[in-house]
């Protein structure tokens, strides 16, 4: 009896710790002449609340639309145009994956996410006329993570794989398509500069509005956060920025992170497929969305499946599955938050070794004159027996990859003698001087790194 009472009390106090409301009296938001919020607080949780509040004041609509997409509610807001996104969110089973991996997330970061959620919810409570879809609220850390999960699946080209299956067009699918324009980053150490200072600069080619437009903010807490930079709608931390010790930024990269598999179905047997010497059965689901007809919301549904490989769809030629690393990771936002708080290159690099962010080039510089470039990503370790540029056989464990290359195994440059690193959405094998570039021969061709130039 006493043991049970202890467990109940422990659970009660544990829950109270992680659900305490933010004291807004500890938060100060000062806007400069450009309207950029400079946010000061005692804790990181309060800081996240302040960021959510300031961003909501400026662009509450975009934050909501991002979360609506991540929580399969966008069609409730915009009707038919939102239905494909809602279906995609359900196809990748974001809710199930996040529920299963939620306990792996650092509790300190969950507190930060909770603070951000409280800020959004309070703004919605005080501005009900600005709420787009009531069902979205209250925002929770899990709802926040579901949007991140969707966004990172799309950035891994997963949506293009899904479209190829729908359209039964795999010939035109090219994950290494070249951009006409590219974001660019560069860092210079004192080996290159003539004033003894280290520099990093970035020109990311982001839109001026929408969910992938930058929002600038300056964050200061008594728990060690001191950073200025930019973030996306709905993210509780800075995604590219500089603190008192270091700076980092991103451009887009396109190594081969995503694969499509065609299942070998058992004839005259519903949803059964061959895998090695076994017969397995697809799990069946129904995704729902809403369309408006004469102002009346009509619910529509579509079947989808799950195989041992991942999300699965049927088209006129068979059943196909999509597999990419982002489908098995939920800690990317946590990793970015920890990057915010890093104090040295070694600390920053160890955070990268979490290997939770599925892509993006990273450029870096710090006050100790370190500069660094890496083509980051969740790159599967694949069996050389197969050609990974097309549709793969989905009937053998030989194609079911489960491991990824470690951070130290990816193309990178650390403190080159040339004194500079750069990237413009192009090949990682041209990221510094000719003599110090990563050598493509050192990397498995199945990693699929870009070889083209840009800008």
Question: Where are the regions that the model predicts?
Answer:
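Second-shell loop/turn segments in exported
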Residues: 50, 97-111, 333-339, 444-454
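Generic, well-ordered alpha-helical scaffold segments in large soluble proteins
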Residues: 116-119, 123-126, 168-172, 191, ...
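Hydrophobic alpha-helical segments
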Residues: 357-455
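Beta-sheet entry/capping signal
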Residues: 28, 36-38, 185, 196-199, ...
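Glycine- and hydrophobic-rich flexible loops that cap the catalytic core of alpha/beta enzyme folds
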Residues: 221-222, 229-231, 241-245, 250-393
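Substrate-recognition/specificity elements adjacent to catalytic centers across diverse enzyme folds
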Residues: 22-237, 242, 255, 325
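Bacterial Sec-dependent N-terminal signal peptides
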Residues: 1-21
């Amino acid at each position: 009896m006493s043991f049970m009472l202890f467990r109940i009390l422990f659970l009660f106090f544990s829950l109270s710790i992680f659900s305490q409301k933010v004291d807004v009296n500890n938060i100060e938001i000062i806007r400069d002449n450009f309207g950029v919020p400079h946010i000061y607080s005692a804790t990181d949780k309060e800081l996240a609340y302040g960021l959510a509040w300031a961003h909501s004041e400026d662009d509450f609509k975009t934050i909501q639309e991002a979360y609506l997409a991540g929580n399969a509610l966008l069609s409730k807001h915009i009707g038919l145009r939102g239905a494909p996104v809602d279906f995609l969110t359900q196809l990748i089973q974001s809710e199930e994956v996040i529920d299963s991996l939620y306990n792996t997330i650092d509790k300190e970061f969950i507190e930060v996410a909770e603070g951000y959620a409280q800020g959004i919810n309070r703004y919605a409570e005080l501005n009900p006329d600005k709420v787009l879809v009531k069902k979205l609220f209250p925002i929770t850390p899990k709802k926040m993570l579901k949007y991140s999960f969707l966004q990172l699946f799309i950035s891994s080209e997963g949506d293009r794989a899904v479209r190829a299956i729908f359209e039964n067009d795999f010939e035109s699918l090219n994950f290494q398509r070249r951009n006409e324009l590219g974001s660019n980053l560069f860092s210079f150490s004192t080996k290159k500069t003539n004033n003894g200072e280290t520099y990093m600069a970035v020109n990311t080619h982001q839109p001026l509005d929408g969910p992938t437009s930058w929002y600038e903010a300056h964050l200061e807490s008594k728990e060690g956060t001191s950073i200025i930079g930019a973030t996306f709608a709905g993210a509780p931390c800075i995604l590219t920025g500089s603190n008192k010790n270091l700076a980092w930024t991103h451009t887009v990269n396109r190594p081969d992170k995503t694969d499509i598999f065609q299942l070998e179905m058992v004839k005259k047997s519903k949803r059964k497929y061959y895998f090695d010497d076994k017969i397995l059965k697809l799990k069946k689901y129904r995704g729902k969305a809403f369309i408006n007809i004469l102002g009346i919301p009509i619910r529509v549904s579509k079947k989808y499946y799950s195989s041992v490989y991942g999300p699965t769809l049927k088209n006129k030629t068979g059943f196909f599955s999509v597999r990419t690393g982002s489908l098995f990771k939920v800690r990317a936002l946590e990793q970015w938050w920890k990057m915010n708080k890093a104090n040295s290159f070694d600390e920053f690099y160890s955070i990268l070794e979490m290997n939770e962010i599925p892509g993006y080039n990273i450029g870096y510089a710090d006050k100790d004159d370190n500069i660094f470039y890496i083509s980051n990503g969740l790159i599967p370790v694949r069996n050389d027996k197969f050609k990974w540029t097309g549709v793969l056989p989905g009937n053998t464990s030989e194609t079911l990859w489960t491991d990824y290359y470690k951070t130290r195994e990816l193309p990178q440059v650390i403190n080159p003698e040339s004194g500079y690193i750069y990237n413009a959405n192009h090949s990682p094998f041209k990221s510094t001087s000719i003599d110090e570039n990563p050598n493509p021969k050192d990397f498995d061709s199945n990693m699929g790194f870009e070889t083209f130039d840009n800008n």
